[in-house]
Amino acid sequence: MASHVVGYPRMGPKRELKFALESFWDGKSSAEDLKKVAADLRSSIWKQMADAGIKYIPSNTFAYYDQVLDTTAMLGAVPARYGFNGGEIGFDLYFSMARGNASLPAMEMTKWFDTNYHYIVPELGPEVKFAYSSHKAVDEYKEAKALGVDTVPVLVGPVSYLLLSKAAKGVEKSFPLLSLLPKILPVYKEVIAELKAAGASTIQFDEPTLVMDLESHQLKAFTDAYADLESTLSGLNVLVETYFADLTPEAYKTLVSLNGVTAFGFDLVRGTKTLDLIKSGFPSGKYLFAGVVDGRNIWANDLAASLATLQSLESIVGKDKLVVSTSCSLLHTAVDLVNETKLDDEIKSWLAFAAQKVLEVNALAKALAGQKDEAFFSANAAALASRKSSPRVTNEAVQKAAAGLKGSDHRRATTVSARLDAQQKKLNLPVLPTTTIGSFPQTVELRRVRREYKAKKISEEEYVKAIKEEISKVVKLQEELDIDVLVHGEPERNDMVEYFGEQLSGFAFTVNGWVQSYGSRCVKPPIIYGDVSRPKAMTVFWSSLAQSMTSRPMKGMLTGPVTILNWSFVRNDQPRHETCYQIALAIEDEAEDLEKAGINVIQIDEAALREGLPLRKSGHGFYLQWAVHSFRITNVGIQDTTQIHTHMCYSNFNDIIHSIIDMDADVITIENSRSDEKLLSVFREGVKYGAGIGPGVYDIHSPRIPPTEELADRIRKMLAVLESNVLWVNPDCGLKTRKYNEVNPALSNMVYAAKPI
């Protein structure tokens, strides 16, 4: 019985690639040094899979930055601004496209489906000259072969590549990207021919866009593309892999009818309906790669349940045509549980990171072949039983409180305009009030203090003194700049989710559970393993301390429940919305305690609300309903005179504007500096959004200091769309990643720009 892994994390068990990349970018090491680290990582991954008995081992899933950018390099689809004149694409050009350079901006980056990974978006148009310009797929296949490992080269499929692209600057937005299919297929043919010549017997095409809402002409593009590739692919085993959701019946029919394709891969963890499609008909003689091991979470697989699913599929496709696989690439999970020395043993027994998932895939394949490892299966069953019955997972009081939420709307009793009137009487703010989003620069010294306190190298007294001084500095600075609503700067927080998770019960934290977000940047999501509750106040001490330093309003700063949920590894033994409601109740307790402590403005950030949107429209309604409801729960008991702010971090609101209004916040600040007036008109078109709105007036992601006149001009443009009594003036995001010598003049210019208007 055969086994397969869709893809594997690239960073290394201790983020070796991250450190090698950053050292190279900083000019501290050579290209050869970087290549050596990368080659060592690849060979250890291939060896690990070979040792685990995996039959179909992927190659070319490694990337120095991103697999879509690798495909752009393979196709020579370099945007004109980089002055590419052909030849093999090297590090300089590759990293310029990814990160920009001194004189040229980077290509755009956006989220990879609904994961927390980001890819570099190809910029295409009718003028692009496609040519085979990176031989990486073939080189890596040969590299593995030289190590004695026969791999399956993985390519981003041609249709998904185009569907994930955008029209380049200067090209009509409506340019039909799929019209470029005849231009890119010749390059794919060259790559396939080279792989064949190098000895490859199986090739994997990732076509994840098949799980999206597709129109008939888009589905036809898949049929056309693989019909065109058919003769080049003859003699090869060809796998088309899909993941992240189930397929519509039309997409399923298109996929299993593709010419020249011998195997189809499905995500059977998130794609629950796909199972029914397979059962209703699967082409005879073709292989089914069954993704039963979850590539997107960190929980141990329920091996007995997976085995039952696989056995039911075996009777449909035949014993020799079924391959056990992961639901998607393991890129989206942590690397290896072995490196978690501080994690509690009981919780650890419930988990499986990428290295453990490879073993699960192999164990399932062996069990199907009649060589079941009884000890492995019974250890798994024992871990699952312990997780089900552990008193650490269940909290009766939380269950009861969450159950009590059903059937109620949880909305503040009065309208937003009545509340704003009450708040204005209390806060007495000027027209065009100024504020910031929350965090201030985190200096090396500040990080050192936090690190030493965590490692118990300094006393609590020393820690509190240092943080207090930092808050005092930030408050004083804002008063000098004449900002109207202040923040305490969040010097005590390392991360907006981790800070709260560490103080809530039901959360666990890893030491090395890093997952790639983009390039060398990794995130370490908390693990929500049990019912969530708040043992004691989390932010009240620091916020009231900050308020005692000024007569101006001080914002309390909380992270919203949907963002905490979407940026964590979430328990899979109850629906996501139930976990979200539990977090909402904990944040509600905190908001009410802040209000009691005299904090009159409370910001509840929902930076990641949009990130949780299901991939297909059919799932949007239910998600938005419970996400918005969760936000409203957090402040339902707050008095009219207390102002609730929220902050959101993306520019595409058109399709969810009604849900944002339904959140019923008093003031909403948004990351708008890049998308400008488009977004503002959304708030006005047909929707009289009565609340305050603070579209970011400058982009904090850039070190550039915007001149006063430019900011004033931007504010005037905003006033052409929004009334002056609702407009707030603020940067577009927190200032944590900037330096004080950038922040001070930028905020000063912002306040000056708002005053005369």
Swiss-Prot record:
Keyword Metal-binding: yes
Catalytic activity: 5-methyltetrahydropteroyltri-L-glutamate + L-homocysteine = tetrahydropteroyltri-L-glutamate + L-methionine
Gene Ontology BP, a term: methionine biosynthetic process
Residues the record lists as binding Zn(2+) 1: H647, C649, E671, C733
A cellular component term, taken from the record's GO annotations: cytosol
UniProt binding sites for 5-methyltetrahydropteroyltri-L-glutamate: K18, N116, R521, C522, W567
Record protein name field: 5-methyltetrahydropteroyltriglutamate--homocysteine methyltransferase
Keywords recorded for this protein, A-Z: Allergen, Amino-acid biosynthesis, Metal-binding, Methionine biosynthesis, Methyltransferase, Transferase, Zinc
Pathway(s): Amino-acid biosynthesis; L-methionine biosynthesis via de novo pathway; L-methionine from L-homocysteine (MetE route): step 1/1
Residues that hold L-methionine according to the record: I437, G438, S439, E490, D605
